[in-house]
Structures are given as C-alpha cells and as structure tokens.
C-alpha cells in the first residue's frame, strides 16, 4: 500500500457518547454482525460520490485515477480484512472529527431511549446510524489509513483503536488517495476471512452500489486449482439501482437500497419508484420507513432526499424537495434539469425545485392514500409512527390540505378506544340527517376527552364527536377549518347550537325554564363579577351541573396550555359559566336564600367546571373551603 510512518503521533480519548455507542453496538448487534460490511461499503460509496461532486469544479482531485471503486482483501494468517476505496479521503482534522466524535444533535436524547432490550436497542441503534463504528462488532482493533484528495502524500493519516477508551492518530506518507480500513478480526469474526462468505454478503447488501465492489481472489489453473497469482474480481452489478427498469428490480433489492440510503436496519413500509419525462426529466425513488426516526420531533433533525443531477451525487438531506410534515420520507431524486454546480441556496428559489417538490409531495400523498384504502392495518402501523407529524400538514401545505386531511386519523365517540382509527371521510358518511358540522373536542388525554361533560347531549342525541388529545390538535384546528364542505365545530365553544336536533315542544320548554331561571343567573353573575365573562343557562348537559366554555373567537383551553408549555405569554382566558337548570345541585343552589351559602354553591359548581375543563384551578383552597362548609352544613 506504499505507506510509511512519519510522525506527530498523539493519543486521544473518545467522546463519551462514542464509548457508550461502541459498547451497546457490540452487544446489541452481535446477532446481525454482517451489517458491518454493508455500513463500511456504503461509507466507501459515499466517499466516491463526494469526490465526484468536488471534482466537478476541480478535476485535478482525481489525480489521474478517475475509476472509482471499493476493494476487499483478507489475510487469514494475520486475521485481517481490509476495505479500501479511492474516494475523497480524510485530512487529520476530519479523521479526529469523524472517527472520534458523534457529530449529531440530540445524542443524549438518543441514549436515553435505549431500553437494554436487545431487539429494541438494535433497531434504535440502526436508526441512529452506526456507520464506521460497526467495524467493532467483528474486530477487536481497527486501523485506518487515509489521505484526502488534493493533499500531498506526506499529509496522510493513520488512525488506530481497540474500541475502548482511546485512539491514536499520527501522520504517515500514503501515495494513493482514499481510505483503507483494516479490521483485526475477533475470533468470532473470522468467518468473514472467507471469499465465499464475503461474496454472499456483498451480493446481499451492495449489488445496488453505483461503483464496482471487487474482491481479491486467487487465479485458478486449468485444473481449477488455486495458484499464488491474485486478481481483482468485481462482485456487484455497479449500476445505480434507480436507473434500472422497475420490472428488473426485486423487492429485496429495493429493501436493501433503502437501508443503504437511510442507514436504517428495518425494511421500509412501502416505496415508489418513478421515471418522469416531460416538462421536467427526473427519477424519484421514495420510501416510507416502517419506524419513525428516534429524533423526528427534534428541531435539528436532518431530513430530506439524496440529490443527484444526471446520476452525479450532489448532496445529502436536500430538504427542499419535501415539505416538513413529510420529513420522514427517505430516498432520492435524480434530476436532468438542475445544474451540476447547484447549491442549497440555488435550490431554495429554483422553479425546477418547486416543481419537483410539488410532484414528490403528491407522489407520497398518493402512496399513502392507496395504502389507507387497500390495507387499513398497514396504514394504522404508519399512523402510529408518523401521525403526529402528518398533523402538521394542513398548516404547512395549503394546496394539499384536503388530501392531507383525508389521511388524518382520530379517536371518536363512535369507537370505544383511544386508538386513532377514524377518518374524516368515515365521520362524514355517518353524519345524521340535518347535521352540517363536524363536531370535535380537544382535551389533555383520551380519558379526559371520553368523560368530558360536554359530550352528554351529543351522546343523548346520537351525534358522533371526534376526540382529540394530542398536544398538536388544538393548533391543528386553527388551520383545519373544513372538510368535504363541512365546517368543524368545537363542542366547548359558546356558539354551539344543537337546536336543529330538538322538536318545537322541547324548545318551548327550554325557553320557559330559561326565563324562570333568569334571576338565578343574575345572582350568580353578581357574585362572580368579572371572574367570568358571562353566566347563562344551558340545556346541553344531562348529568353535570355546570361547565365553562369560551367564545367562538377566544383562545381555547388546550391552545393556552400549548402556548404556556412552549414558554410563550398567554392572555387570560375569560370563560362563560353555563349552569344546568335541570340538575339537582343547581336547583339546591337556586333555592338557597342565604347569600353567603349561595356563594359557596357557586364556588363549588364553578370549581368543578374549571377542574373538568382545565385539570386545575387557580385557588383550590377557596374551592375546598366552600365544599367543607356545605358538607358541614349538611
């Protein structure tokens, strides 16, 4: 390999997260240890992609060696397996940065999710992306020799570690550009010091890699016996998978390519591969993962597609081709219309980009529509993983609001379960005659929603109510105002009107009761003063004495909680206090002549209503004093 040791050797400690990852990986991924080869070959392929990209503006980086590839060789006598590439290579600073630290945000959050349960942890670690560190699954020591393209031969670097607490790094001379990774195999890793085992793994994981992957093999004589002469034999097809005809690609190949582009260990849920010719010429290969990325809700989560231009790799995580609510989509887009020197800044305001973004978005939504229609169970698997981010869609993607809304799922009073299985389409199909609104309720939890006093009249009248209890739901409903021509109506708002479901006799009786009860309403308002916006009677309740509601255009309880949790200033919510004149406790309050005792009744009923609505009250002691006083009197 033409390397000679130079100088400037130093010993450095691993970042603490690296130590933790190495330990967990060796134990959690042991049963699937062959993935180390997929990871290392994938990294080598990425290094070739990066060299191609940089060489577009600086062809001298090829150093008269533009035939890029990956080569594997092994030495049974020395127990070593070597993976070599002639890609971009690394400088000393890059070696320390890439091989000594984990340059990811949210690393601590990732480790906190680990359960010490092997199957779950291996899945999480796979999502995190182990890359280079997977070498330690089969090796008790790893040596890296690398030189960055464009640097002098004497600016190469040697990195070595036994995968424990530290590593060494030193300057060497290396004539060839690129990286050699030498694995000093463990006893239980020696199965990979075998040509046929390596062929099997490469065929399984790396057929789709766009550069040749070759293995060193002995030349056989005329009788078929091995000689001392060796040659390099290409093992993979070395054709970019997305450039092949769909009919020639097996499901297994699509699945392995997904693992290559996503560094996920699990198979994808579904995918879509399309070649489009016309106004824009491009190929897209889009995958829906089966599991949500562990850091999907992290603001710094990197998302986006791999971008190729005319089959030349340009960048990872090109987020411009997918809206934020579809940030879980993995895959690539290969455009013939973008310039090869395209940058993230150019992509931002590019008409081609906007056109491709619209097309890719519609492609993903169509995939999900078909899944929801044809495989309800599989769609529920998707919803459990990605439902929360899909609820960001109506606010972000006005053009596709109706499409996204049709994909949303909720709990409802129709289904006695916290599972979010009800579509808006199915709700509309079940609407009663005369019903022109979609009724919904937001709450802190399913239990709070299911047992809300606001539901009583809806249950009595057989009206279905959508139950929302995700933190994002109240925010969502600011943007999702109608579906299929039907307006949404919160059942906790003052403007709720169910009169179309009541007969004339019932309406007349309510009017009489309201007039009879007017003096009680005025006494209550006089006692409470400006603590509430208004006091009035309600006939929407059956078993509950009182509730609080907000005006149609005033901030609701759940939105106030959402803003407070985000650390934002929240204006005071002024509630309307509604009392049920048919309830025994309200009648007792109405019959109370003593104003002090009447006030205690008001405190108890308002306290109950606030507790049911908000889950808390501003002055619990006042509430308890009123209860104790009434109980003592009783």
Swiss-Prot record:
Region annotation (A) ranges: 1-344
Which branch of life, at top level?
Bacteria
Report the main location listed first in the record. cytoplasm
Stretches for region B: 345-561
Q: Where is this region: C?
A: 562-634
Keywords, ordered alphabetically = ATP-binding, Chaperone, Cytoplasm, Nucleotide-binding, Stress response
A UniProt-annotated Pfam family: HSP90
| CDD domains named among the record's database cross-references | HATPase_Hsp90-like
Q: Name one GO molecular function term.
A: ATP binding
Any one Gene Ontology cellular component term annotated for this protein = cytoplasm
Task: Write out the annotated subcellular location.
Answer: Cytoplasm
Extent of the signal sequence: none
Q: Which family does it belong to?
A: Belongs to the heat shock protein 90 family.
- Give a short account of what the protein does: Molecular chaperone. Has ATPase activity.
Q: Which proteins does it associate with, and in what oligomeric form?
A: Homodimer.
Tell me the protein's name: Chaperone protein HtpG
Ranked from the top, the taxonomy reads: Bacteria, Pseudomonadati, Pseudomonadota, Gammaproteobacteria, Vibrionales
């Amino acid at each position: 390999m033409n390397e000679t040791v130079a100088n400037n050797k130093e010993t450095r400690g691993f970042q603490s997260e690296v130590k933790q990852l190495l330990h967990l990986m060796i134990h959690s991924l042991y049963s699937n240890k062959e993935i180390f080869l997929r990871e290392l070959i994938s990294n080598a392929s990425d290094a070739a992609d990066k060299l191609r990209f940089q060489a577009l503006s600086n062809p001298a980086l090829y150093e008269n060696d533009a035939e890029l590839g990956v080569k594997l060789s092994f030495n049974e006598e020395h127990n070593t397996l070597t993976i070599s590439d002639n890609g971009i290579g690394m400088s000393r600073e890059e070696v320390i940065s890439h091989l000594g630290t984990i340059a990811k945000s949210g690393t601590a959050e990732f480790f906190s999710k680990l359960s010490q349960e092997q199957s779950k942890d291996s899945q999480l670690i796979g999502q995190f992306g182990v890359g280079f560190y997977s070498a330690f699954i089969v090796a008790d020591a790893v040596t890296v020799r690398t030189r960055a393209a464009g640097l002098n031969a004497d600016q190469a670097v040697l990195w070595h570690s036994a995968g424990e607490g530290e590593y060494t790094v030193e300057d060497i001379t290396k004539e060839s550009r690129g990286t050699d990774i030498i694995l000093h195999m463990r006893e239980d890793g020696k199965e990979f010091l075998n040509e046929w085992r390596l062929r099997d793994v490469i065929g399984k994981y790396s057929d789709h890699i766009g550069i040749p992957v070759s293995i060193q093999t002995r030349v056989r004589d005329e009788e078929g016996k091995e000689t001392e002469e060796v040659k390099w034999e290409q093992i993979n097809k070395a054709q970019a998978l997305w450039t092949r005809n769909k009919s020639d690609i097996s499901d297994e190949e699509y699945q392995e390519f997904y693992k290559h582009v996503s560094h996920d260990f699990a198979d994808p849920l579904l995918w879509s591969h399309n070649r489009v010719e016309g106004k824009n010429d491009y190929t897209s290969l889009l995958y829906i993962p089966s599991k949500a990325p562990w850091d999907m809700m992290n603001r710094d989560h990197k998302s986006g597609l791999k971008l190729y231009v005319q089959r030349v790799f340009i960048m990872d995580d090109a987020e411009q081709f997918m809206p934020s609510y579809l940030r879980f989509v993995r895959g690539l887009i290969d455009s013939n219309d973008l310039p090869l020197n395209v940058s993230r800044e150019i992509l931002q305001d590019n008409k081609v980009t906007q056109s491709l973004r619209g097309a890719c978005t519609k492609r993903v939504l169509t995939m999900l529509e078909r899944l929801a229609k044809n495989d309800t169970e599989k769609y529920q698997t998707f919803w459990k993983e990605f439902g929360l981010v899909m609820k960001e869609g109506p606010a972000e993607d006005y053009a596709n609001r109706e499409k996204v809304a049709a994909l949303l799922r909720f709990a409802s009073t129709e289904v006695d379960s916290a599972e979010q299985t009800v579509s808006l389409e199915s709700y509309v199909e079940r609407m009663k005659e005369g019903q022109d609104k979609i009724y919904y309720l937001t709450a802190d939890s399913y239990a709070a929603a299911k047992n809300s006093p606001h539901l009583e009249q809806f249950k009595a009248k057989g009206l279905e109510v959508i139950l929302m209890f995700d933190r994002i739901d109240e925010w969502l409903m600011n943007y999702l105002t109608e579906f299929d021509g039907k307006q949404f109506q919160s059942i906790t708002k003052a403007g709720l009107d169910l009169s179309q479901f009541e007969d004339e006799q019932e309406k007349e009786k309510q009017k009489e009761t309201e007039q009879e009860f007017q003096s009680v309403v005025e006494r209550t308002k006089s006692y409470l003063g400006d603590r509430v916006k208004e006091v009035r009677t309600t006939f929407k309740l059956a078993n509950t004495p009182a509730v609080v509601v907000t005006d149609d255009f005033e901030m609701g309880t759940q939105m106030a909680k959402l803003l407070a949790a985000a650390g934002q200033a929240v204006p005071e919510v002024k509630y309307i206090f509604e009392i049920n004149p048919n309830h025994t406790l309200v009648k007792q309050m109405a019959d109370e002549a003593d104003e002090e005792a009447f006030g205690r009744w008001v405190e108890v009923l308002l306290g109950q209503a606030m507790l049911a609505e908000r889950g808390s009250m501003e002055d619990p002691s006042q509430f308890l004093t009123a209860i104790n006083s009434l109980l003592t009197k009783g």
